[in-house]
A protein has these predicted regions:
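Acyl-donor (CoA/ACP) binding surface of acyl/acetyltransferases
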Residues: 1-39, 54, 58, 67-172
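Donor nucleotide-sugar recognition loop
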Residues: 41-44
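Active-site rim helix/loop that mediates acceptor-substrate recognition in acyltransferases
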Residues: 46-64
Length: 172
């Protein structure tokens, strides 16, 4: 049996921690039930959102890395999911982010993505980090560019559509 540890990381305003069903799932299910998820695979009902959360946690077991629940330290509120992602069939190892609607516009995705990228380089030894962004997701494209990433290529995913693959050129 694989055992794994999800590291807890703190940055200025945020706490990276493992996803906790009791604390996080209601907000996660609301997020996945919203129109906001059109760039993250589409809306899910509550039971499908639970399975998506289980897959997210399983990624840590299979790959040894994954996504963290992001908590605002000042309030204890769940802000979203940010982390490292590379499921079967995905075009590249990537930094991904999804911030719940009420926490957007505060720089949380940027702050978290900077630290997740640093973790990929320093703790995991990645040579390159990407972000795979569905065409049309202007907010995520803007964040990738703010992070210093450049458009490297596009990739047609069989179920998701056209991904724009941004390469993060800034190292640790």
């Amino acid at each position: 049996m694989n055992t794994f540890n999800i590291p807890t990381i703190e940055v200025k305003r945020l706490l990276f921690r493992k996803f906790c069903e009791e604390r996080d799932f209601d907000a996660y299910a609301v997020f996945y039930g919203s129109e906001q998820t059109r760039y993250y695979g589409g809306q899910l009902d509550r039971s499908s959102a639970w399975r998506a959360a289980a897959a997210m946690m399983g990624h840590w077991v299979i790959r040894g890395y994954g996504a963290w629940a992001i908590e605002e330290k000042a309030t204890g509120d769940f802000c979203g999911i940010v982390g490292l992602w590379y499921p079967e069939g995905w075009p590249e190892q990537e930094i991904s982010w999804s911030i719940v609607a009420e926490k957007q516009g505060r720089g949380f995705a940027y702050e978290a993505a900077v630290r997740a990228r640093q973790y990929a380089y320093e703790a995991l030894g990645w040579d390159v980090v990407h972000s795979c962004i569905l065409e049309g997701n202007s907010a995520s494209k803007g964040l990738a560019q703010k992070l210093g990433a450049v458009l490297e290529r596009s990739d047609d995913h069989p179920t998701r559509g056209k991904f724009l693959i941004y390469r993060h050129i800034e190292g640790p």
